[in-house]
Amino acid sequence: MKNTLNFLSSALMVALFMLISTAVSAQTTRDEFMSKWQNSKQFTLDVLDKMPDSGMDYKTDPAAMSFKEQIHHIGNAMVGISQGYLKGGDPGFTIDLATASKADLAAFVGKSYDYAAATMKALSDADAGESIEVFGNNVTRRQVMALLMDHSTHHRGSAIAYLRVEGVEPPAFVGF
């Protein structure tokens, strides 16, 4: 009987340790992601800041988005995808791109990053791991979070190419 109790006590302690370490690991992973998210926000704002006002409407091709549209698209997609797939509510802000100044666009993008961050942080671990259909694919909300990071990186990279074509040295990449 004593051996059985010792075994059960040990098994319970191991199970409890595994449960706690899993929860800590999930939180650490999310914290690391959010740290990188803030880095992405700052880098995007730095890219926007580098473009002179005269280059905001520059397009690499008539069918392409302008620099201003690329940057707007980063923020607008964050808001839309966060609302549609990450359980985000009304962000409480919008922008009229046609009349927006560079400062207005920077404020919009900053708020978009903050809104998406708050939406992601509000997801429970169960919600983050839930599989949902997104653009015809069955993915978890964690994968949608990664999609937002990839999407912003893609369009920020395009914006950096626009800077170079305009003869502007882009900001240095900061990984962390």
Task: Give short role names for the model-derived ranges.
Residues M1-T28:
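Bacterial Sec-dependent N-terminal signal peptides
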Residues L16-M18, Q27, L86-P91, A103, ...:
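Short hydrophobic/aromatic-rich motifs at helix boundaries and adjacent loops
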Residues L19, M51, D127, E169:
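Residue-level signal for pocket-adjacent positions within structured domains
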Residues M34-Q38, Q42-L45, D53-T94, E133-F176:
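Short, contiguous alpha-helical
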